[in-house]
Structures are given as structure tokens and as C-alpha cells.
From Swiss-Prot:
Keyword Acetylation included in the entry's annotation: yes
Residues with site note (May be involved in allosteric control): 156
One Gene Ontology biological process: glycogen catabolic process
Enzyme class: transferase
Family: Belongs to the glycogen phosphorylase family.
Chief location of this protein within or outside the cell: cytoplasm
Record keywords, A-Z: Acetylation, Allosteric enzyme, Carbohydrate metabolism, Cytoplasm, Glycogen metabolism, Glycosyltransferase, Nucleotide-binding, Phosphoprotein, Pyridoxal phosphate, Transferase
Source species of the chain: Mus musculus (Mouse)
Localisation per UniProt entry: Cytoplasm, Cytosol
InterPro entries xrefs: Glycg_phsphrylas (IPR011833), Glyco_trans_35 (IPR000811), Pyridoxal_P_attach_site (IPR035090)
Sites of N-acetylalanine modification: 2
Annotated site residue numbers, Involved in the association of subunits: 109, 143
Protein name according to UniProt: Glycogen phosphorylase, liver form
Length: 850
């Protein structure tokens, strides 16, 4: 007799991840075996699991390439406006499963792999994360690429193909240790090298001014070799391109006079040129003016703009008169979005191309340049803003410095004309800062050189307008906009939480995957006890799966019915992992004080990387791991409280932990987190949020109702008032006995008995240099956590609140964000045309998604 189907299997029969056709499965198996034999040159006797992963990846890629080519043909034929998303980071994660979902192949692939006697999950786990980003900024770029393809926009992501991505984090004896992320060592089946589009990038040299114009001469040349990765939209046959540049030394690099020099040394020196794309810089929100980093920023910009102009000239809009290309139509055909200030050199570089090479008059070139560029600001922390030393720019990019000076002069002339007596305003608004050595303020360059500037959440955009760039918004108020960040529901629901995705589809249909606002329909089920129980059941399945993963990876046995309290993001003082840690110790002390008292069991999971040079962040990790050591080994605590530090947090680990989370920690000091996107991922996956009124938390509370989040602590105005009054940490320490006990324990070596003064730097910072005011929010945070525990005991009330949050999360789709960018900044129209494959029609496009 057949076994009864599990809930998961029943749901898969009506899954939104594609219908399994017998032909599909047979074709996939055939493709798999073909690649195993002809691409990998293996048979089943000698093939390894990695070979099977590669065979599957190539098979899936076969289904991409036709769509990829048709998409590019369609863009060439129709000449739509194109948007270029310039970012030094693209935190893509893994590609295989996301591609299967977006092509509607997942169930067919699952079935084919099952019939081949292999384990799909095992194959998916073999793929390396493409960790070409630090955190939110790079992951946002990845979500945006998915949305741009899904919305049918002619979009390109441009960045650097780092040989080493964000470091792998190991925890040894409680300390973070960094290891290189050699993510390409086994090869990457998703990329295609395009040596035919290799381009020269110039550095150093000098500037010659002649009668005929200005020339940048005697430069060192590095070649930029593009690698293309396909970016499939969801079920629309659109496949866009992410083009990442790799640095190569030219053949004659340092060899011009090797006869009199050292040929071997000259060849070895080629590494110097190729170092440009060697490694991603870890971000600690603290700007350091490193020459190699500036080279990276110019490298991506120079290669990309040559590519953009080549593509424009090849289109019907790149018309020529007797003098050369006419660029009047350029801003109507090209939009370039700068993801933070890292690609800001694109502004003087485009001016250099227009003025020096294409011989446009300055005023004309400037008008076109401004209309082309837009800038997204991602941080309000002043120490994080890029300010490059003038002498470094002068050495590396002498012509660009001249252009920046010229831009600044014209900008300041305008300020003087408008505010003739306001010298301090002129100094504040200059692109060149004079204090402590001349520096170029890259954010000011972006604001002056772009037609639109946006923040990434309402509260952040307000701070940008009224505080950080107040002078500029007074000058051009219409330039400043808000575009609240979003996340792609394909990866952050369908891929990572298929149980919940299918459950939602049962109730409201499948269209929500491309229109997340439809989740509001779930509001009508908040009183449906059966549905609430099903949602709770999916959460429990995810928790069970994750607890098995934790036991396997960390050898810690946890209680899967405990509350999973999760805090995963970069380790930084402003994100306040320390506040969470103080609460953990407080809970520990309460259990020890009264072991018989009922305590709502919790598993506190903290994860994230500290930048290698950021001492305080590394100390915070050591404190968390030391506290975990004590708590997890105390028999009196047992399964009531467990603390896990998640090693090497990355996209593929986020996909596991987020669906299993009950409580999401979003506790930055109000006014410091620009937006956050982790908060949105947790909300969509049925976790409740404990957080401050900061970043996108504010809008999450607006959407779901503040009563459906656990909001605590100071608001932005309270923080400002406390700054004005003067923050005295000691006052809180003296007034709050539980806080005093916790701090004394850390200070006297309770968590580091072999090194009692191990955490003196943390204690010293908390008392005397804490810009993020941990003590000021401690009491409110602990009280709010008590409310969380209380509600968790009432599972029906908890699950009702969960459903209200899921139903309110539709705003936070990156599809909505990208539609706003397209309408308000890029002047582009999303398209719901489904590009037909060549055998479907002659004109290459079918309407109505057919």
C-alpha cells in the first residue's frame, strides 16, 4: 500500500515551482548525462558529487542560453532605454536553485535528479557562494538585478570579478579568523568570458594641453576582461547580463626594454596589474584611502563607460554628423545608477570622454552627464563617507583631478552667485575639503554630477535631506528622493521557504510571486485557525530542519520548540550586537537566580563577520562566544537558554536560518541604519521583529501596525536630545541593578576566567566612547523582550501576529523598489512582454505573457 503523502509532498503537487512534464524530465536527464560525458569527461564510475553538480549546472544553463541570446537580440532590435547599475559589490550567493525557479524547471530537475539516483540537496550544497559583497549593499544589488530582469527592463549590472570574495570566517577559540575565499578554484559554470570585448584602462601618466585639446599621455595600461553571468527574470524568458571585469596585464607590460632589464621579473610584475581584481575590500564603515581600492573604483568605471558608449554608438541613436557621434540622445537611451559613492569617478570619466575624446563643448558634456547619472546614498555615518586625498588622485588620475576642479569651480561660482556673503556655506558645499589635507568628497561629487539622489528608506532620506546634505537639498530640493529598499521574493520566499510559498499560493494563487502587494489578501485569514496552524507547522518544520543542521555543524543540541531569537548581520557597534549580548547575560542571571521559575526557552543565534581591521567588532564576537561557552555548559540552565554564534554567515546560510526564525533582532541606534533588508526577509518569512524606530523598521511598523512589532527604545529625536544633554553611561549603570551586575561580570572576568581583563576595551568603550548608547536603551529592550516571551506562550496570538506581518510585507519587494526607480529616476517603463524563443514566433516577442 502506498505511503500517505506528507504535508510538504501534498503542497508540492500544487507547487508554484513548475509542472513536471515527462518530456522535460527525460530531456534533463539526457542533458545531464551528455554534460557528464562530453563537458566533464567522466562516467558514473569515477564522477564525484562535484562533477554531478557541474553536470546539472551546465544542463540548466543550456535552458538559459537561448533565452539569453533572444533577450539581447530583442534589445538590439527594439532599442529600449538601457539602465546600467554600477556597483563595487554584487552579493549573489548561489545560482543553481534560483535559476531553476526562475525558469520554472525546479520540479522537473528534482524529478530528473531523483530518477538518476542522486540527492538534489547535496548537489545544491556543493555550489560556492559568489560572495562578491560585504552585506546589505551588495545583496541589494543582487536583488535589484533579479527584479530588473523580472520586470523586463533592459538592465546590466557592472562590477568587478574579484578572485577572492568576502573572506571565510572561522571561529577558533572564540576569535574570528579570516581565510581567503577562493570561490573560483573549482571553476564557475555560470560565467562566460568575453575576451573579444577586452578594453584598456589607463592609470598614472600626465596631462598635455595643446591647441587641439587635452590629452592624457604616458599612462600605464591595464586590460579589463569581461565575464558575463546570465540574470534570468521570473518566468518571462528575459535573461539580462551581469558583466564583471577582471584585470589583465597587457602583453608588453614592463617588457618594452627587457633586453636591458630582467625579463623574468617583468613577467612576474604582471601580477601588480592583475592585483586590481584580486580581492574584495571588507567594509567596516570606516573609510581608508587605499591606492588599490581607488584603482578598483576607477577600473570598473573606465571599462564600463567604454562598453556603454560602444553599445550606444552601435544603436540607431548613435548617429554621426561630419564631426563624429551625436550624443544628444544619450540620456534618453542610457541611465546609470551609482550604488553608493564607490563608482563616483564615472562622473569625471564620462566628462573626460565627452570633452577630450568626443570633442563636445564643456557645457553640452556636463548637461548630458548630469541627465545620465543618479546616485544612491547608503550611509549616514560620517566616518564611512569616501574622501580621497587630492595628491593620490593627482598621481593616479591626473586628468580626472583637473576635471573635478573644473566641476567644483563652476559649482562654487553658482553658490557665490546665490549666497554672496555665505563663505561657510561655500566651504561646506565644496567638492574639495581643505581641513587636514586636501580631500575630494565623493558624495558631494555625486550630488553635483547627478540629476537624482536617493536614500533607501523614508527616515534615512529625511536625514539625508535635513542633516547630512542639508545645504544641497536647500539648493536643489527636487533632486532628493526616497526609494525604500526591497528584497526579491523569488530567492527570499520561493527558494528559501517553499513550504510557506506553496501554502500562500493555496490561499491566494500564484500571482503574488510577481506582485507581492497581493499578500494583503492574507488579512482575510487572520481568524482562520486551521490556516494559522498550517503556518505554525511550516515554521516548526523549518526550525526542526535548522536545528538538525546546527547539531551537525556545531555539535550543539538545541530545543526546536524553543523560541529562535536571531541576530544576523555584519558585526558593527551601530548594529548593537552588544545590546543583545547584555540581554543574554541578563536572562542567564535570572535563570541562575531562580532556577525553578518558569522561563520561556530561547535559542539565541548571532552571526556576522567583523571587518579584519575592526578591533571592537572582533572583541564583540569574542564576548558573544565566551558568553555562549558559559551559558551552554551550565547544567542549571539546560535547554532553557542556548547561545549559538553562526560561523561564516553568508547568503546560503541566511537562506537556512531566516525561514526558521521566530524573533528578528533589528536593534540599531535610531538614525544609524539607512534601511536594512534583513528585517524585510524575516518579516516575509513569518518572524516577528524586535527593533528600534530606525531604517525600514519604521515603514514595516507603518504597514503592519506598530502593535504588530516589538518596538522599543529611543527615537531619532530622543537620540539627538540625549546628545545635546550629554550621554552619561554611568548614570544608567548606577540606576539599573541588572545592568550593573552584567557589566561587572564582564569586567571581572566571569566570562574569561583565564584572562579577567580580556574585555576591558569593551567596558571602556561602553562607559566613555559609546556613540551608539547601548546602556540608554538597555532597560526598554529588556522589558520589550519580556513582552516577546509573554506573547510566545500564547501561540495563537503569536501566529496571528505572524500572519499580519506576512500580509503586510508586500511593500518590501524589490520589484516595487525597481518600478519606482524606473518611473521617477530612469524614465523607463517595465514590460510584461514575454520574449518568445526563436521557434515560437518570427518577431521574437509575444504579448500577454504568451
Amino acid at each position: 500500500m502506498a505511503k500517505p503523502l506528507t504535508d510538504q509532498e501534498k503542497r508540492r503537487q500544487i507547487s508554484i515551482r513548475g509542472i513536471v512534464g515527462v518530456e522535460n524530465v527525460a530531456e534533463l536527464k539526457k542533458g545531464f548525462n551528455r554534460h557528464l560525458h562530453f563537458t566533464l569527461v567522466k562516467d558514473r564510475n569515477v564522477a564525484t558529487p562535484r562533477d554531478y553538480y557541474f553536470a546539472l549546472a551546465h544542463t540548466v544553463r543550456d535552458h538559459l542560453v537561448g533565452r539569453w541570446i533572444r533577450t539581447q537580440q530583442h534589445y538590439y532590435d527594439k532599442c529600449p532605454k538601457r539602465v546600467y547599475y554600477l556597483s563595487l559589490e554584487f552579493y549573489m550567493g548561489r545560482t543553481l536553485q534560483n535559476t531553476m525557479i526562475n525558469l520554472g524547471l525546479q520540479n522537473a530537475c528534482d524529478e530528473a535528479i531523483y530518477q538518476l539516483g542522486l540527492d538534489m540537496e547535496e548537489l545544491e550544497e556543493i555550489e560556492e557562494d559568489a560572495g562578491l559583497g560585504n552585506g546589505g549593499l551588495g545583496r541589494l544589488a543582487a536583488c535589484f538585478l533579479d527584479s530588473m530582469a523580472t520586470l523586463g527592463l533592459a538592465a546590466y549590472g557592472y562590477g568587478i570579478r574579484y578572485e577572492y570574495g568576502i573572506f571565510n570566517q572561522k571561529i577558533r577559540e572564540g576569535w574570528q579568523v579570516e581565510e581567503a575565499d577562493d570561490w573560483l578554484r573549482h571553476g564557475n559554470p555560470w560565467e562566460k568570458a568575453r575576451p573579444e570585448f577586452m578594453l584598456p584602462v589607463h592609470f598614472y601618466g600626465r596631462v598635455e594641453h595643446t591647441q587641439t585639446g587635452t590629452k592624457w599621455v604616458d599612462t600605464q595600461v591595464v586590460l579589463a576582461l569581461p565575464y558575463d553571468t546570465p540574470v534570468p527574470g521570473y518566468m518571462n524568458n528575459t535573461v539580462n547580463t551581469m558583466r564583471l571585469w577582471s584585470a589583465r596585464a597587457p602583453n608588453d607590460f614592463n617588457l618594452q626594454d627587457f633586453n636591458v632589464g630582467d625579463y623574468i621579473q617583468a613577467v612576474l610584475d604582471r601580477n601588480l596589474a592583475e592585483n586590481i581584481s584580486r580581492v574584495l575590500y571588507p567594509n567596516d564603515n570606516f573609510f581608508e584611502g587605499k591606492e588599490l581600492r581607488l584603482k578598483q573604483e576607477y577600473f570598473v568605471v573606465a571599462a564600463t563607460l567604454q562598453d556603454v558608449i560602444r553599445r550606444f554608438k552601435a544603436s540607431k541613436f548613435g548617429s554621426k554628423d561630419g564631426m563624429g557621434t551625436v550624443f544628444d540622445a544619450f540620456p534618453d537611451q542610457v541611465a546609470i545608477q551609482l550604488n553608493d559613492t564607490h563608482p563616483a569617478l564615472a562622473i569625471p570619466e564620462l566628462m573626460r570622454i565627452f570633452v577630450d575624446i568626443e570633442k563636445l563643448p564643456w557645457a553640452k558634456a556636463w548637461e548630458i552627464t548630469k541627465k545620465t547619472f543618479a546616485y544612491t546614498n547608503h550611509t549616514v555615518l560620517p566616518e564611512a563617507l569616501e574622501r580621497w586625498p587630492v595628491e593620490l588622485v593627482e598621481k593616479l588620475l591626473p586628468r580626472h583631478l583637473e576635471i573635478i576642479y573644473e566641476i567644483n569651480q563652476k559649482h562654487l561660482d553658482r553658490i557665490v552667485a546665490l549666497f554672496p556673503k555665505d563663505i561657510s556655506r561655500m566651504r561646506r558645499m565644496s567638492l574639495i575639503e581643505e581641513e587636514g589635507g586636501k580631500r575630494i568628497n565623493m558624495a558631494h561629487l555625486c550630488i553635483v554630477g547627478c540629476h537624482a539622489v536617493n536614500g533607501v528608506a523614508k527616515i534615512h532620506s529625511d536625514i539625508v535631506k535635513t542633516q547630512v546634505f542639508k545645504d544641497f537639498s536647500e539648493l536643489e530640493p527636487d533632486k532628493f528622493q526616497n526609494k525604500t529598499n526591497g528584497i526579491t521574493p523569488r530567492r527570499w520566499l520561493l527558494l528559501c521557504n517553499p513550504g510557506l510559498a506553496d501554502l500562500i499560493a493555496e490561499k491566494i494563487g500564484e500571482d503574488y510571486v510577481k506582485d507581492l502587494s497581493q499578500l494583503t489578501k492574507l488579512h482575510s485569514f487572520v481568524s482562520d485557525d486551521i490556516f494559522l496552524r498550517e503556518i505554525a507547522k511550516v515554521k516548526q518544520e523549518n526550525k526542526l530542519k535548522f536545528s538538525q543542521f546546527l547539531e551537525k555543524e556545531y555539535k550543539v543540541k538545541i530545543n526546536p520548540s524553543s523560541m529562535f531569537d536571531v541576530h544576523v548581520k555584519r558585526i558593527h557597534e551601530y548594529k548593537r550586537q552588544l545590546l543583545n549580548c547584555l540581554h543574554v547575560i541578563t536572562m542567564y542571571n535570572r535563570i541562575k537566580k531562580d532556577p525553578k521559575k518558569f522561563f520561556v526557552p530561547r535559542t539565541v543565534i548571532i552571526g556576522g563577520k567583523a571587518a579584519p581591521g575592526y578591533h571592537m567588532a572582533k572583541m564583540i564576537i569574542k564576548l558573544i562566544t565566551s558568553v555562549a561557552e558559559v551559558v551552554n555548559n551550565d547544567p542549571m540552565v539546560g535547554s532553557k537558554l542556548k547561545v549559538i554564534f553562526l560561523e561564516n554567515y553568508r547568503v546560503s546560510l541566511a537562506e537556512k536560518v531566516i525561514p526558521a526564525t521566530d524573533l528578528s533582532e533589528q536593534i540599531s541606534t535610531a538614525g544609524t541604519e539607512a534601511s536594512g533588508t534583513g528585517n524585510m526577509k524575516f518579516m516575509l518569512n513569518g518572524a516577528l521583529t524586535i527593533g528600534t524606530m530606525d531604517g525600514a523598521n519604521v515603514e514595516m511598523a507603518e504597514e503592519a501596525g506598530e502593535e504588530n512589532l516589538f518596538i522599543f527604545g529611543m527615537r531619532v529625536d530622543d537620540v539627538a536630545a540625549l546628545d545635546k544633554k550629554g550621554y552619561e553611561a554611568k548614570e544608567y549603570y548606577e540606576a539599573l541593578p541588572e545592568l550593573k551586575l552584567v557589566i561587572d561580570q564582564i569586567d571581572n572576568g566571569f566570562f574569561s576566567p583565564n584572562q579577567p581583563d580580556l574585555f576591558k576595551d569593551i567596558i571602556n568603550m561602553l562607559f566613555y566612547h559609546d556613540r551608539f548608547k547601548v546602556f540608554a536603551d538597555y532597560e526598554a529592550y529588556v522589558k520589550c523582550q519580556e513582552k516577546v516571551s509573554q506573547l510566545y506562550m500564547n501561540q495563537k496570538a503569536w501566529n496571528t501576529m505572524v500572519l499580519k506581518n506576512i500580509a503586510a510585507s508586500g511593500k518590501f519587494s524589490s520589484d516595487r523598489t525597481i518600478k519606482e526607480y524606473a518611473k521617477d529616476i530612469w524614465n523607463m517603463e517595465p514590460s510584461d512582454l514575454k520574449i518568445s524563443l526563436s521557434n515560437e514566433s518570427s518577431n521574437g516577442v509575444s504579448a500577454n505573457g504568451k
